[in-house]
Amino acid sequence: MVPPRTVPLFVLPMGIFPLTQEPLRVFEPRYKQMLDDCVLEESSFGYISTVNPPEGIGGWALPSEYGVLCVADNLEEQGSNLLFTASGETRFRVLDILPASLPARDFGEIFPSVDELVEEYIEESPDGKLYLRAEIEELPPLKGIVHSDRWNKLVRRWSEHIVAIDSLVRASGRGREDVLPIMEGEFLPYTESGLWSACQSILDGYDDRQRALSSEEASQVIDVLENALEEKRAQMDAIRFMMESE
């Protein structure tokens, strides 16, 4: 087992999954400091969702239990913002949280610089940071695989869900015969990357996302995906029934 280590935390409502990517923009001093530290130290950060129900520490949103170690790729400045791509790698579990050196404050539309804020705590806490950190344990790779029949069925159901949403909002007008070949070309045969991409696309509930991240086996992850798609199908049927009844 990999020994525990301390990492910066990037806390947002949804989080990310391993082997997936997400373009992000930061403007807060705490996350600018975090990115500077990660670039200088060539280290990763922990991208993690906020805990549900919400709790805080020093005014900052507390993280959930499970997250994903990420590297910051394609970092660039755009005015006062930093743009980058979070590239998910391995999963982790939070063991202990290290608070930020300063409490949360509302700065309005104009943020102070990182250096100005560091001056407020550097004497009392020379090793402090503006961002939350955590002692974590990295989780091992998923055990096993999803067998082809089960995975192929999930890709078909996923395609049908995409078509159902498209039909409901009257978007592209694409049918199953249009969407399924695209999905099969992208996600067949089974790969762990495809499994996590499905999680990123399908799972929008806090409990489902945490359950997937905490899984030990690939079969447990696809259990979560199958249940989520079934719930979404029932929701779509209910919405369609209400619309037809009006």
Where are these regions (language model features)?
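N-terminal low-complexity, acidic/polar interaction/targeting segments
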Residues: 1-246
